[in-house]
């Protein structure tokens, strides 16, 4: 009898053990990303996500999102954050900072409570959308509600949504303060306060708002700051508002190791011709092209479209709903090229971008660092090409010195091994719905990476929008004159652009 009971107990234990081993096999995990990675994300201590003893439901979301092992910043941050200690973390762009604070934040949420338990602040609307999506993706099995709120959208909609339980609030400082001041967003029992891109959030324009927001939180809150750069103002905030923070610095060098940087000296009027040459010679999966002004963004996007390449553009003057659509469609691979201002330099994670082009060279090292960090994400390879004119030569030298990096002259032929992958269709993309994902994957598989001219041709009508959606309509006469001056710099004849419409495919 005793032997029978022992055998039965043993079989039960074996069954439970087998069930424990099999749970991961039952997950709907994406195909493994086979691209090589640099030491920016592979130089780890060898920890696994299971070593953090987090909820099974959270691990399910992590693995189903395609995560395999924690990156260095995640290894350093997650165990400390789970204890509730304040954290000041500095790591390179594209090394997994977002998941480093999202995972412990999700772990500490009590889904049975209806109170807001975490506030995540970011400096831009696009980054707010992206961060909230990471929270929803990783926490999809936890039964929690994540809400994103930013300026440029209806305040009444946010007020209505806050009538329901919101466990994690992600937003830009101004809008969150507006909701908290009106008593709509209750942060009185919100123990977690996170700032991503903290150097930007603690700039003079945001600091007063941040300090007001902190006053709505309980005194025993946990404050976590994440950024690639930490100016002196961060130290002032740390001394004033943080309690014995655990400091993490993984910045042995500032630029990502997987990004190869080149410059090309070119006269202003020859820049478009140079860009056309780059498009014809490079194997671009997706590219982001940066300009220093919104006028130049629109004009360059129009010119690229006229050259026969698919192109979107985005800048701060566009309506928020149109910016959102451009961002969403570009992330999902609808278009190969995006022209933008510095609106998208911070935190935006688009795995498929393998080329960044600075059509206009930035004025400072911080902007340069954030721009080129849009390629080479999460330890992968990327290319940064800078078009330099005579006036930029001193900035080029200054940025090299400040970042401790070398920007080389562009060679006649660029080695494809530096930025091209054998199977670009396997690069992970955000999934909005399965049917859309299948359609995008099929498009990528059936389109040659070198045949860019016929991928979403500019006048096909698919993304040809009426004037007023990010076009020239509605501007003052002075802005139109400014646009005309910029147009002449690109080599357009006088009076070519009437200012009434734009043929660049935007939304």
From Swiss-Prot:
Signal peptide: none annotated. This is ATP-dependent RNA helicase dhh1. Residues 258-418 form the Helicase C-terminal domain. It comes from Aspergillus fumigatus (strain ATCC MYA-4609 / CBS 101355 / FGSC A1100 / Af293) (Neosartorya fumigata). InterPro entries: DEAD/DEAH_box_helicase_dom, Helicase_ATP-bd, Helicase_C-like, P-loop_NTPase, RNA-helicase_DEAD-box_CS, RNA_helicase_DEAD_Q_motif. Belongs to the DEAD box helicase family. DDX6/DHH1 subfamily. One of its GO terms (biological process) is mRNA processing. It is an enzyme of class 3 (hydrolase). SMART domains: DEXDc, HELICc.
